[in-house]
């Protein structure tokens, strides 16, 4: 009869106190730590060498026995979905709620079918340092493990890895659940699993049950393990599992840095266990002395032309090298590697095993199963820093600690920042990428720049990101100086406000308007500042001087004075003076008075004599001429959370003025509340940078000051050479801690590399063409974006839901298909 055994018996865990795992048979105290990886493959050769060297140094601080465990798991996006559900419940716009639901469905699908996350753990046991004391207290053990953990943490932080573990019992339980219960953890996230176990005990023992009263193995022991079918595999919770090892004589003779990553990067359904055992140097020296003596004696009796003589000389040289290395303070180590391969069926598991074995043969390595030792291999794979001696002996390879640096395993890179928005999938590993550019602990500022030539997917990437930021509750402002209509569908679909500024358009923003600001949040932070606040009118007139310098760029000092006097008189005609209280309309419950328009200023300039004549004449076009739509009161609403200002219908001559009006209005709104996130996005920024010097200066100002108002400035641009050659372009890049680079031609890639530090591999990928030819037409595949944030570089495949794609695509084929579908629906409706 087949035996199905509860794996509670396999755990050998007595308890978990704080974050210390206490095992039995034998009794051991083990600390488990988790570390984030780095994007090692995209580092330059010199950076890789430095990391390997640093890891070699780090190994000297490691305990005598160290277990490194790497697991591949489906990406857990439950916390991001939970946050999005919360935002959805608070959302007032029904259109936005529908978009949030679409994104949640996509995230659920991604986590089940595509997303893979690599997690990296280190476990090590408490070891006595000698002496007569054999019964240390738990506090002494915990203190020793804590110090060792801090030493490992500091050493790995020097390599670029940060710790992800928390010194708590619940974290340790969740980590063990992920490491041991692969099938369960894929079907039931930790939060749900924890709640189910606790509720089960509450039903049986009452409401006073807490985490400490429940046997710890209930949280991380699989439901069952069945090893009776075959000596070559076992079944754990319905998952087929085979444990394998790298034979001692099958390791690479010359290893490149990070070679250990080939095991968990080639196939998703694997985990890797790597043990490092430092041997006693005195014992090794005694053994070496004996072996060297015997080999020297043997060498005297062997002919120098014999093959045996060469082998013996090599052995002697290796022995002397080890002896000298130990004398220099290096550690003599034995390492061993075990690979666990999972499958949803027997055939699936065997196919993956054969695929991995053939892959390793091509790497001049070998892979063998732990035949007849599946239960022992299961116990060895538990992250308790232990191992089966027989399996270890089959796989062990001696190596000096200084050479172990090439085994550096923390080489994947995941980017799942708490509170971030989903951008897409990590191109290298398939894991989802969540970016929170507002995280001040990671980023000096929240600004972003998106670079790419025409047709590379800049606007697609920008709109995808902005829609998701809006779904997170962030206020979005977009200025579109080119093809603003591309934003219209997405804006309206999420319940936004689409504003077109152009001659003949009914919508208008009055540049003369002094807008009342909501200072409630600032007053809570700074106290009521009414008494110290400067004159609002003076600040407004200063802004208007900048605006009129666009209309009259060569204005003389006399004309500036005439303009200033005319502005003061114009506002005075409406009862507005330098006193801020004069702005209040006594008949409208604290609202501001009616504001002048350009036509009112035009009249004052007409009365200013010859010195005001030139400004008067140039302003006439905006009052009674073809651009008279600028001479209207404001009739748009900026209270919406997604606002697009389309200035693309303006001529090159009028564009700087339209841009100034739009950004002036948006900045007024953005500066009101320093506690709420907001984004000012400028698409096709090169258009504004070229429009005029003042336009470029204003854009730079936005990028510099927005951080102080809990904001982010996001720019998307082509014509990279011109922008980067411009002093203002360089200032914007310096004030943007995050850059997104899309595929570009050689010339543009080289221009970017001059201001952004890229490796040769990154340059190759950027210059790679993304065009495919089909049926005589060119179609661009989904863009792969290189995100450069601080020292981290990662290629991301932008992923949009079907709903999002239909709203933001600019592909003629996609739009034609949408038009056909809409026409068909209309015909069916009629």
Where are these regions (language model features)?
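The start of beta-strands in P-loop NTPase/AAA+ ATPase cores
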Residues: 29, 120, 475, 641, ...
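H-loop/switch region of ABC-family ATPase nucleotide-binding domains
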Residues: 480, 717
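Conserved beta-strand scaffold positions in the cores of enzyme catalytic domains, especially
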Residues: 447, 478, 498-500, 642-644, ...
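Active-site-adjacent "gating/activation" loops or surface patches in catalytic cores
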Residues: 27, 410-467
């Amino acid at each position: 009869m087949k035996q199905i055994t509860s794996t509670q018996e396999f755990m050998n865990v007595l308890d978990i106190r704080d974050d210390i795992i206490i095992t039995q048979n034998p009794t051991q105290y083990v600390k488990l730590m988790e570390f984030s990886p780095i994007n090692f493959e995209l580092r330059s050769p010199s950076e890789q060498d430095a990391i390997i060297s640093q890891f070699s140094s780090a190994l000297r601080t490691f305990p005598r026995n160290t277990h490194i465990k790497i697991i591949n798991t489906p990406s857990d996006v439950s916390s991001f979905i939970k946050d999005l559900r919360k935002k959805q419940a608070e959302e007032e716009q029904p259109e936005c709620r529908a978009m949030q639901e679409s994104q949640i469905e996509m995230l659920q699908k991604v986590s089940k079918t595509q997303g893979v996350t690599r997690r990296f753990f280190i476990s090590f046991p408490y070891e006595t340092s000698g002496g007569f004391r054999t019964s240390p207290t738990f506090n002494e053990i915990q203190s020793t493990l804590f110090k060792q953990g801090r030493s490992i943490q500091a050493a790995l932080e020097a390599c670029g890895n940060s710790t992800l573990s928390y010194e708590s019992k619940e974290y340790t339980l969740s980590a063990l659940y992920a490491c041991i219960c692969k099938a369960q953890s894929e079907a039931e996230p930790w939060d749900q699993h924890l709640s189910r176990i606790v509720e089960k005990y509450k039903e049986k023992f009452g409401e006073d049950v807490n985490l400490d009263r429940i046997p710890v193995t209930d949280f991380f022991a699989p439901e069952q393990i069945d090893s009776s079918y075959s000596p070559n595999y076992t079944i754990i919770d319905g998952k087929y599992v085979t444990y394998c090892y790298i034979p001692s004589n099958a390791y690479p003779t010359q290893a490149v840095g990070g070679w250990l990553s080939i095991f968990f990067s080639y196939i998703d359904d694997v985990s890797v266990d790597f043990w490092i055992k430092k041997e006693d140097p005195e014992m090794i020296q005694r053994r070496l002395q004996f072996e060297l003596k015997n080999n020297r004696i043997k060498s005297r009796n062997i002919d120098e032309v014999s093959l045996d003589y060469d082998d013996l000389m090599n052995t002697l040289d290796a022995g002397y090298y080890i002896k000298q290395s130990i004398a220099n303070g290096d550690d003599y180590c034995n390492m061993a590697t075990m690979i666990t391969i999972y499958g949803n069926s027997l055939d699936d598991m065997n196919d993956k095993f054969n695929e991995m074995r053939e892959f390793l043969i091509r790497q001049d390595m070998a892979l063998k199963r732990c035949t007849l030792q599946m239960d022992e291999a299961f116990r060895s794979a538990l992250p308790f820093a232990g191992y089966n001696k027989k399996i270890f002996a089959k796989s062990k390879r001696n190596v000096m600690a200084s050479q172990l640096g090439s085994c550096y395993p923390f080489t994947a890179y995941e980017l799942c920042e708490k509170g971030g928005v989903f951008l897409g999938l990590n191109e290298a590993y398939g894991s989802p990428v969540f970016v929170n550019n507002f995280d001040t602990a990671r980023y000096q500022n929240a600004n972003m720049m998106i670079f790419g030539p025409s047709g590379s997917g800049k606007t697609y990437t920008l709109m995808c990101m902005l829609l998701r930021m809006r779904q997170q509750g962030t206020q979005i402002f977009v200025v579109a100086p080119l093809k603003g209509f591309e934003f219209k569908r997405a804006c309206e679909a999420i319940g936004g406000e689409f504003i077109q500024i152009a001659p003949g358009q009914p919508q208008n923003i009055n540049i003369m308007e002094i807008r009342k600001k909501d200072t409630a949040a600032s007053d809570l932070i700074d106290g009521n500042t009414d008494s110290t606040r400067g004159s609002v009118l003076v600040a407004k007139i200063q802004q208007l001087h900048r605006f009129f310098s666009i209309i009259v760029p060569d204005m003389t000092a006399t004309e500036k004075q005439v303009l200033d006097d005319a502005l003061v008189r114009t506002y005075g005609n409406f009862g507005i003076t330098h006193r801020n209280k004069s702005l209040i309309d006594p008949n409208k419950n604290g609202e501001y008075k009616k504001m002048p328009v350009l036509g009112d200023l035009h009249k004052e300039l007409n009365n200013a004599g010859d010195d005001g004549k030139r400004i008067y004449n140039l302003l006439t076009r905006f009052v009674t001429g073809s651009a008279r739509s600028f001479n209207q009161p404001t009739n748009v609403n900026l209270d919406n959370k997604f606002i697009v200002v389309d200035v693309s219908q303006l001529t090159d001559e009028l564009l700087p003025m339209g841009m100034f009006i739009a950004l002036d209005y948006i900045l007024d709104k953005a500066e009101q509340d320093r506690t709420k996130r907001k984004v000012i996005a400028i698409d096709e920024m090169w258009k504004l940078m070229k429009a005029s010097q003042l336009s470029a200066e204003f854009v730079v100002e936005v990028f510099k000051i927005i951080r102080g108002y809990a904001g982010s400035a996001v720019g998307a641009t082509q014509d990279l050479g011109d922008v980067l050659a411009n002093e203002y372009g360089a200032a914007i890049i310096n004030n943007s801690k995050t850059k997104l680079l899309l595929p570009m031609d050689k010339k543009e890639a080289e221009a970017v590399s001059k201001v952004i530090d890229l490796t040769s591999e990154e340059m190759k990928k950027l210059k790679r063409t993304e065009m495919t030819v089909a049926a005589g037409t060119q179609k661009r595949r989904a863009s792969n974006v290189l995100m450069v944030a601080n020292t981290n570089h990662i290629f991301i495949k932008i992923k949009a839901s079907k709903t999002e794609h239909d709203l933001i695509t600019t592909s003629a084929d996609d739009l034609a298909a949408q038009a056909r579908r809409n026409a068909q629906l209309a015909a069916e409706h009629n």
